[in-house]
Swiss-Prot record:
Residues 769-780, 808-828 have a biased composition (Low complexity). Pfam families: Gelsolin, VHP. Keywords: Actin capping, Actin-binding, Calcium, Cytoplasm, Cytoskeleton, Phosphoprotein, Repeat. GO terms for molecular function: actin filament binding; mRNA binding. This is Villin-3. Binds actin and actin filament bundles in a Ca(2+)-insensitive manner, but severs actin filaments in a calcium-dependent manner, regardless of the presence or not of VLN1 (AC O81643). Acts redundantly with VLN2 (AC O81644) to generate thick actin filament bundles, to regulate directional organ growth and in sclerenchyma development. Residues 900-965 form the HP domain. Residues 769-828, 840-906 are annotated as: Disordered. Belongs to the villin/gelsolin family.
Length: 965
């Protein structure tokens, strides 16, 4: 590069100074800032640069730069964006990860900045923008793909665009429709509901109606007829034909190339980090993604050339449009890059230190690039992490001879390094009756047989508690705060009490050094609070002392409390309590650093020098959430960026890595056999992250089941406890939360067989309801509220639909049910909902209807509704762990008539969902049933009898309104 000074583009002055998103649009080959009010709007004729700045827990800033290329943009503008991206990176210190984003093929990371989706707009700088406020509303049809990051694509508004494999959103002026292809993905259906809510709020002022249309269900819902009318009437839809844009690149084994003077040259041999030299650029071809690796001391012009070389490589190989190009800098490689290597030695696994950044800054400045704000670090203050509710029941067993032996109360908290322990903590949290935290603790000198026994017994205990406990495997020295806080005092002692430990010592020809109250022992106390109040027995020599801690020296009948010059008052108080715990009633001799007696040094074998340096804490890192898969037998993980609670899919297992702990979250709808592999999956991840990220093999590992998440897991999310209580698959959950209804999806793998007697009773009630209204007159005008035509034909169609729903073959044998509602329950629920609309419409159209006739209709419908609710409740109870767990609780019976007469009542204040003094031991789905008759009428404005005659959806709305849902 020439020696002339290169002036930083004014648009990039002061960038990356605070966390957030900054966007520029390329206009006349120059970057122009996009105001925040316009973030998320991308015009198809333009190219954009997006900078995402995040601040990690250590206080340093991290940068990701994306340049987005619209499908109608010019090649020159796209090239300008690529060059300006490199210049922006240089202004940030040359350490950003850069991504090329092609419209329609954006990375999940890019889309995660603009949840729930982006909707590319027509036009651009050159062709002129279309202002939405100047346009008349245009009906649009979209495909909605992606189970986490949503790819929304507008397609022609025509029947030929529909297929059986995708989810579609039809956005009309009056109503938004979701069309679920028969073979479409459950998670994509759920995400489409989120997009619909976004469209409704953003473009319809929150007032548009929403309708769900299921492929192949023409006759069961009135919305289906309305939907097909918009396409000119119903007709079969064609099979999906993949377009060129939908071709997904195939992942291939990684192949490394060097880049020199814009040319790529293949490098043979097994991939190794040592092959990457810091003064060169490389191309790593993974098939679906191309990585450019840039050495830390390469020049800016070399980096620009490398980007162009990668684009030329993709073009020459005729790769699909969806092929991603990502540029990474030495020392800041993301997991997706490092995972292509068998190992990634930790020498440079973490970002370069300040000295390294200074060298980069000097080099770039020499090249003429002005730098601002390379990094800003803030001091890290120790925060007390979330701990479990106090006042629970703590039980501890130690493992001995293939069985567990309970520890007496006065020994709880004394853990020996040669032994294994089971720790069960039972406590109350929120509305649930009981929560459980079950831990296996492995001493560093414990044997393999005892560890396996502990795991086996923990599994047995978990099964006896119906799968509800949060399970943890914890190794000595890696105890997390929530484990330490369980004990009033926790002291890790040398030796062991189990026969397994003693036998291993005998085999080694040693008697061991098991702690006893009479032995010489030195105990280090470094904790300052309940979350870190762990004490540790260390070698009884003077070199073990540290000026920042307190120590207890036990020698015969004497107990010294040694106080380091830099220790805290809290440590000193804790040390005194530990002394009383180990030797109750003993007299403590205080010894401040520098004033020790000769007897103190004699017990330690003589005075020696010791450290006065504070032990550095482990590196604090940001949490990362992963999904996983097996590709040709190889375990692979994929990061979920900018994650939130909604990314935890009930059909899957997920891995949360905080670097200090690893959690395996197991969804309710995961196959039971897969659930049993949770710890195996977690260990596979630890092995992988150990080789790539330097994760400790002894990191605490947890198994957490959906609905039983503890506070120390939910703290990493903006957690909404109401979401965790909704039953069903991803689609059913989202429908219940967003639409306030259970529009359930048929599960082809399960079918609910209810007896002929139940079906006959429901159909009899239905017939009674229709016969009572057969003499009514109805208006010929169309009822917009439900899209029905009225009259005998409407009733006949609804009756036929419900008959079909209830008359399933009784001879078919039902396979084991999965969690959530079964297919027949889904059909019946939809049919009953349709019936509700029919009856409501009939009453609205007949003002002269007698009160007695209306009462008959209400009674008949309530009988069907009650039968349906009882059926669904029974099915949920058979498949739901939460329902199994609550089976022991006192609760009203499922029959509404019996609920009304329950003898147990509580005040409205205590029954509310967010009560400060919540009731326990009740059925939380029927809070209202525990109100007295008087208070029920005060709250709801009606008698219980009238309330339970209402449709289920209306009951739920009222319960939500009064905080009883």
């Amino acid at each position: 590069m020439s020696g002339s000074t290169k002036v930083l583009d004014p648009a990039f002055q002061g960038v990356g100074q605070k966390p957030g998103t900054e966007i520029w649009r390329i206009e006349n080959f120059e970057p122009v800032p996009v105001p925040k009010s316009e973030h998320g709007k991308f015009y198809m004729g333009d190219t954009y640069i997006v900078l995402q700045t995040t601040q990690n827990k250590g206080g340093a800033y991290l940068f990701d730069i994306h340049f987005w290329i619209g499908k109608d943009t010019s090649q020159d503008e796209a090239g300008t964006a690529a060059v300006k991206t490199v210049e922006l990176d240089a202004a940030l210190g040359g350490r950003a990860v850069q991504y090329r984003e092609i419209q329609g093929h954006e990375s999940d990371k890019f889309l995660s900045y603009f949840k729930p989706c982006i909707i590319p707009l027509e036009g651009g700088v050159a062709s002129g923008f279309k202002k939405p406020e100047e346009e008349e509303f245009e009906t649009r049809l979209y495909t909605c793909k992606g189970k986490r990051a949503v790819h929304l694509k507008q397609v022609p508004f025509a029947r030929s665009s529909l297929n059986h494999d995708d989810v579609f959103i039809l956005d009309t002026k009056e109503k938004i429709y979701q069309f679920n292809g028969a073979n479409s993905n459950i998670q994509e259906r759920a995400k489409a509901l989120v997009v619909i809510q976004y469209l409704k709020d953003k473009f319809h002022e929150g007032t548009s109606d929403v309708a769900i249309v299921d492929d192949g269900k023409l006759d069961t819902e009135s919305d289906s007829g309305e939907f097909w009318v918009l396409f000119g009437g119903f007709a079969p839809i064609a099979r999906k034909v993949a377009s060129e844009d939908e071709i997904i690149p195939e992942t291939t084994p990684p192949k490394l190339y060097s880049i020199a003077d814009g040319q790529v040259e293949s490098i043979d041999g097994d991939l190794s980090k040592s092959m990457l030299e810091n003064n060169k650029c490389y191309l790593l071809d993974c098939g679906s993604e191309i990585f450019i690796w840039v050495g830390r001391v390469t020049q800016v012009e070399e980096r620009k050339t490398a980007i162009q070389a990668a684009e030329d490589f993709v073009a020459s190989e005729n790769r699909p449009k969806a092929t991603r190009i990502t540029r990474v800098i030495q020392g800041y490689e993301p997991h997706s890059f490092k995972s292509n290597f068998d190992s990634w030695p930790s020498g440079s696994a973490t970002p370069a230190n300040e000295e390294g950044r200074g060298k980069v800054a000097a080099l770039l400045k020499q090249q003429g690039v002005g730098l601002k704000g390379l990094s800003k670090s803030t001091p890290v203050n120790e925060d007390i992490p979330p701990l479990l509710e106090g006042g629970g029941k703590l039980e501890v067993w130690y493992i001995d001879a293939n069985s567990k032996t309970v520890l007496s109360k006065d020994h709880v908290g004394k853990l020996y390094s040669g032994d294994c322990y089971l720790v069960l903590y039972t406590y109350h949290s929120g509305e649930r009756k009981e929560d459980y935290f079950l831990c296996c603790w492995f001493g560093k000198n414990s044997n393999q047989e005892d560890q396996e026994t502990a795991v086996r017994l923990a599994s047995t205990m978990t099964n006896s508690l119906k799968g509800r406990p949060v399970q943890a495997r914890i190794f000595e020295g890696k105890e997390p705060p929530q484990f330490v806080a369980l004990f009033q005092h926790m002291v890790v002692l040398k030796g062991g009490l189990s026969s397994g430990y003693k036998n291993s010592m005998t085999e080694k020809g040693s008697s061991g050094e098991t702690y006893t109250p009479e032995s010489i022992a030195l105990i280090q106390v470094s904790g300052t609070g309940v979350h870190n109040n762990k004490a540790l027995q260390v070698e009884a020599v003077a070199t073990s002392l540290n000026s920042y801690d307190c120590f207890l020296l036990q020698s015969g009948t004497s107990m010294f409390l040694w106080v380091g010059n830099h220790s805290t008052h809290e440590q000193q108080e804790l040390a005194a309590k530990v002394a009383e715990f180990l030797k109750p009633g003993t007299t403590i001799k205080h010894a401040k650093e520098g004033t020790e007696s000769s007897s103190f040094w004699f017990a330690l074998g003589g005075k020696q020098n010791f450290t006065s340096k504070k032990v550095s804490s482990e590196t604090v890192r940001d949490p990362h959430l992963f999904s996983f898969s097996f590709n040709r037998g190889k375990f692979q993980v994929e990061e979920i960026h900018n994650f939130d609670q909604d990314d935890l899919l009930t059909e899957e297992m997920h891995l949360l890595d905080t670097h200090a702990e690893v959690f395996v979250w197991v969804g309710q709808c995961v196959d039971p056999k897969e659930k049993q592999t949770a710890f195996e999956i977690g260990q596979r991840y630890i092995n992988l992250a150990g080789s790539l990220e330097g994760l400790s093999p002894k990191v605490p590992l947890y198994k957490i089941t959906e609905g039983n998440e503890p506070c120390f897991f939910t703290t990493y999310f903006s957690w909404d406890s109401t979401k965790a209580t909704v039953q069903g698959n991803s689609y059913q959950k989202k429908a219940a939360l967003l639409l306030g209804t259970h529009h359930v999806v048929e599960d082809q793998s399960s079918s609910g067989n209810q007896g002929p007697r139940q079906r006959a009773a429901a159909l009899a009630a239905l017939t009674s309801a229709f016969n009572s209204s057969s003499g009514r007159t109805s208006s010929p005008s169309r009822d917009r509220s439900n899209g029905s035509q009225g009259g005998p034909r409407q009733r006949a169609e609804a009756l036929a639909a419900l008959t079909s729903a209830f008359n399933s073959s009784p001879s078919s044998k039902s396979p084991p049910r999965r969690s959530g509602l079964t297919s027949q329950a889904s059909q019946r629920a939809a049919a009953v909902a349709a019936l509700s609309q029919v009856l409501t419409a009939e009453k609205k159209k007949s003002p002269d209807t007698s009160p007695s006739a209306e009462a008959k209709d209400e009674k008949a419908f309530s009988e069907v509704e009650a039968t349906e609710e009882a059926t669904e409740a029974k099915e949920e109870e058979e498949v739901s762990p939460a329902a199994e767990a609550s089976a022991e609780e006192a609760k009203p019976k499922q029959d509404d008539s019996e609920v009304e007469t329950t003898g147990v009542t509580f005040t409205y204040e205590r029954l509310q969902a967010k009560s400060e003094k919540p009731v326990t031991g009740i059925d939380f789905k029927r809070r209202e049933a525990y109100l007295s008759e008087v208070e029920f009428k005060t709250v709801f404005g009606m008698e219980k009898e009238s309330f339970y005659k209402l449709p289920g959806w209306k009951q739920d709305l009222l319960k939500k309104k009064f905080n009883l849902f």
